Curated annotation (Swiss-Prot):
The lineage of its organism: Bacteria, Pseudomonadati, Bacteroidota, Cytophagia, Cytophagales. SUPFAM superfamilies: P-loop containing nucleoside triphosphate hydrolases. GTP 1 binds at residues 9-16, 56-60, 119-122. The keyword Repeat applies. PROSITE patterns: G_ENGA. GO terms for molecular function: GTP binding; ribosome binding. GTPase that plays an essential role in the late steps of ribosome biogenesis. This is GTPase Der. Keywords: GTP-binding, Nucleotide-binding, Repeat, Ribosome biogenesis. Gene3D superfamilies: 3.30.300.20, P-loop containing nucleotide triphosphate hydrolases. NCBIfam families: GTPase_EngA, small_GTP.
Length: 435
């Protein structure tokens, strides 16, 4: 079981900078704009052989009618509830703020170890100013600089002293990683929240609500998954803020690190150019692809509506013809568990291995019936085929003249492999080697 440390505090005290220092990567978005982190998100850290999960949270604000700030408070409450140790960050450059006092009163009631961290203590003046925070009545004050690392070693010694065990190294290893992608407001966060049964990400009718890629664990059918809810990806010309630009970079990174990409499409809008760009990105990165057409409950239907809609998607995506397509309604919870079964199938297809003997028995017969066409009076003779030990299905065909095999014949071989062995939802790579 991983130990959990939550980083909390009012806006713009450096929580995300400290989070990134602990986990050793720029996972959370950092910006001078207050309220950049809206959701809670997780990273893994280690200190002196002790492993722990770190939760970064949004800035806690009271007395505001802003819809986002109200939901951020809920996210912070959930993080506090999950945590074994709470790091309460304050700003030495500003001194004691009334929100610090209000938040101190709140977390004092949690009955959990709370460590008061005076961030931005990166010069002598601020170091002396950090003593002001003793008036919060939270015990010892730990001055640090998340920017340059000053004081973090001593702080982490204190943090791990509260752990009951050493935790796990890389607890996510081997767990299927699913990136939920799509245009803004396609229903990505609502989908993840519906599966989890909790408000893991903030959901409103306003596009662009999710700014960071939010990671969640999900157990179903005796299997564990990691779902990554991402910010909506839109065209570069429509990106108006630096923060949105960084959000999209995180979404692309989530795609690159995933095993299966779930692309959410709004049924009322149909498949659009940016949907196709995302699918092509997943294809080029050799990821499994599941297309979920959301808001299907809003479409007037007859017996052929789904078939026609699916044909339109496949026509738009040519020559990519393998994604698994499903129609769902997150609002009405229609086919949500079936969608997880589809994701599971695609994940298993991506890792499927075909024995060489079975592969040759089936595919060489097809090659005998339809050999590669001659090029420049050169005849290609394929001797055998084997599957390579790669993350996504790759098949090597050994032949006398690999340079003369055309792309159309590769598509023919891919079609036959799919017909015999069912690789729905995953790309297949064909390579040729000289024998």
């Amino acid at each position: 079981m991983s130990n959990i440390v939550a980083i909390v505090g009012r806006p713009n005290v450096g929580k995300s900078t400290f989070f990134n220092r602990l986990v050793g990567a720029r996972i959370a978005i950092m910006d001078d704009e207050s309220g950049v982190t809206r959701d809670r998100h997780y990273g893994e850290a280690e200190w002196c052989g002790k492993f722990f999960t770190v939760i970064d949270t949004g800035g806690y604000v009271t007395g505001s009618d802003d819809i986002f700030e109200g939901q951020i408070r809920d996210q912070v409450d959930i993080a506090i509830d999950e945590a074994d140790v709470i790091l309460f960050l304050v700003d030495s450059d500003v001194g004691v703020h009334h929100l610090d006092q209000e938040f101190a009163n709140k977390i004092r009631r949690s009955k959990k170890p709370v460590i008061l961290v005076a961030n931005k203590s990166d010069n002598n003046k601020r170091l002396h100013m950090s003593a002001e925070f003793y008036e919060l009545g939270m015990g010892e004050v730990w001055p640090i600089s998340s920017q340059n690392g000053t004081g973090t070693g001593e702080l982490l010694d204190e943090v791990i002293s509260h752990f009951k065990d050493e935790g796990e190294e890389d607890p996510n290893k081997g767990i299927p990683r699913i990136a939920v992608l799509g245009r803004p407001n396609a229903g990505k966060s609502s989908y993840v929240n519906a599966l989890l049964g909790t408000n893991r990400s903030i959901v409103t009718d306003q596009a662009g609500t999710t700014r960071d890629s939010i990671t969640s664990h999900y157990n179903v059918f005796g299997k564990e998954f990691i779902f990554v809810d991402t910010a909506g990806i839109r065209k570069k010309s429509r990106i108006k803020e630096d923060v949105e630009y960084y959000s999209i970079l995180r979404s692309v990174k989530a795609l690159e690190e995933s095993d299966v990409c779930v692309i959410m499409i709004d049924a009322e809008r149909g498949i659009e150019s940016q949907d196709m760009n995302i699918i092509w990105m997943a294809h080029n990165n050799k990821k499994g692809i599941v297309i979920l057409v959301n808001k299907w409950d809003l479409i007037e239907k007859d017996s052929k509506t789904a078939q026609v809609f699916q044909e339109n998607i496949r026509e738009a995506l040519k020559p990519i013809d393998y994604p698994l397509i499903m129609f769902i309604s997150v609002l009405n919870k229609q086919r949500l568990f079936q969608s997880v079964e589809a994701i599971m199938k695609v994940y298993e297809n991506r890792g499927k291995r075909i024995p060489t003997s079975e592969l040759n028995d089936k595919i060489l017969k097809e090659i005998d019936y339809n050999p590669p066409p001659a090029t420049k009076q050169k005849y290609v003779k394929i001797k055998y085929v084997t599957q390579l030990p790669t993350k996504s299905p790759t098949f090597a065909f050994f032949c006398n003249l690999p340079q003369y095999v055309g792309e159309s014949y590769s598509r023919f071989l891919e079609h036959k492999i799919r017909g015999y062995f069912d690789f729905e939802g995953v790309p297949i790579s064909i390579v040729y080697r000289k024998k």
